[in-house]
Each structure stands twice: as C-alpha cells, then as structure tokens.
Amino acid sequence: MIYAGILAGGIGSRMGNVPLPKQFLLLQGKPIIIHTVEKFLMYKDFDEIIIATPQKWINYMHDLLNNYRLDDKKIKVIQGGDDRNHTIMNIIESIEQHKKLNDEDIIVTHDAVRPFLTNRIIRENVEYASQYGAVDTVVNAVDTIISSNDAQFISEIPIRSEMYQGQTPQTFKIKELKDSYLSLTQSQKEILTDACKILVELGKPVKLVKGELFNIKITTPYDLKVANSIITGAVDND
C-alpha cells in the first residue's frame, strides 16, 4: 500500500510575527497546506493521506478540510511529534493501528509548506522507492557551495557538479525506515534529524529523484512573496 505523510508540525518562527503557523497562512486566498493536500489528492494511488500537525491545531485542520470540501475518507489528521523524524514515526504508528505493514508498503513524506510539488515528482518517488527502498528529491546546486568548520574561513569548496539541494518528498519502504530509526541511539536520533541521512549513515542506498526549482519551501516572508509570484504565473503541475 502507498501512504502519504504531510509534515505540518512546525510553528513557523522564521515567518515573523504572524497569527498562524506558516502552513495555515494564505497563498492566493487559500491556506498553503490546502494547496499541498490538493496536490496529493491528484495522485490517485494513495491509500491514505495522513496530516501531522500540532495538537492544538488538529481541529483547525479538520475545519479547513471541511471548508474546502476536502473531507475525503482517505485523509486523516494526527498529532505531530517533537521533531521531524518523531512526526514521521507518529504517522507510521497511526498506520499500524489499523493496518499490518508488509515489506513493500511505502510512505511519501512531504513538507506541508511545499505546495508546488508535481505528479511527476510523486510518481517517480513511489516508483524508485519500490525499487531501491528510499528516495530523496533534489535539484542541482546552482551556486557554489562553501564549507566552513568555524564560520569564519573556508574549509572546503566541494565540486559543484556533485552538489544537490534537498527538497521533499522523501519516500521510503516503511518497515525499513522504522527499523533503521529504532536502531539508533538517543544521541544519534538527536543528530540525524533528516530521515534520508539515517539510511545513508547506515550504509543503505537512497535514490535521487529530480525535483523542480519552483518546488520551494515557504518558511520566510520572502518565500511567501516568491510563492505568490509562482502561483500567479500559472506554473504547470504535470
């Protein structure tokens, strides 16, 4: 089975003085997270779409889904965790409460504040996760990447053609991700905050899927301005 996990656990501190968490801010008159949910509903192979949000915003999320007539039976809203990976584990636990997982079950995890993902990106994530077990969505690094050990001087300038910027979705065979996460020590869990990095550190393959430059993450007021420019430009979603 194929599951979607929409990660909406953040409060958006980098967005500044705003009345709502960033995922609920309006983008062309509609909450960002609603744009994202609509994109997931366009991909018809999902058996369940699980939205993980702070507990105090669960009822608000339900109200939004009702207001925008997205009260689809396959959508479920649960409480997120203390961090990204904890939120993903909460989603997996929610699935396990009513389904027995098998080795081929897949979860597509995605930032709620990336509303411009495409069907192609989702489709390739699912296809490659079925084949390789784990997938990360990336775009080529446009700028030269600088590494500094002390934030004062350059330590290294990696070869740009080998550098990529990570996006989401990140997609996994569920049992493999869960088993990998549970194998970590508490200190490792605190350091390895990216799910793909857990698998990489354990020596497991993570396949790359080409993202899109417009698949941006909306975390600052500037990002929101860029997102409004993208959406008014009628960027195609294939």
UniProtKB/Swiss-Prot annotation:
The record marks R160, K217 as: Positions ribitol 5-phosphate for the nucleophilic attack. Pathway: Cell wall biogenesis; poly(ribitol phosphate) teichoic acid biosynthesis. The record marks R14, K22 as: Transition state stabilizer. One of its GO terms (molecular function) is 2-C-methyl-D-erythritol 4-phosphate cytidylyltransferase activity. Its EC number is 2.7.7.40. It catalyses: D-ribitol 5-phosphate + CTP + H(+) = CDP-L-ribitol + diphosphate. Pfam families: IspD. PROSITE patterns: ISPD. GO terms for biological process: cell wall organization; isoprenoid biosynthetic process; poly(ribitol phosphate) teichoic acid biosynthetic process. InterPro entries: IspD/TarI (IPR034683), IspD/TarI_cytidylyltransf_bact (IPR050088), ISPD_synthase_CS (IPR018294), Nucleotide-diphossugar_trans (IPR029044), TarI (IPR034709). CDD domains: CDP-ME_synthetase (cd02516). Keywords: Cell wall biogenesis/degradation, Nucleotidyltransferase, Teichoic acid biosynthesis, Transferase. Belongs to the IspD/TarI cytidylyltransferase family. TarI subfamily. Catalyzes the transfer of the cytidylyl group of CTP to D-ribitol 5-phosphate. PANTHER family: 2-C-METHYL-D-ERYTHRITOL 4-PHOSPHATE CYTIDYLYLTRANSFERASE, CHLOROPLASTIC, RIBITOL-5-PHOSPHATE CYTIDYLYLTRANSFERASE. This is Ribitol-5-phosphate cytidylyltransferase.
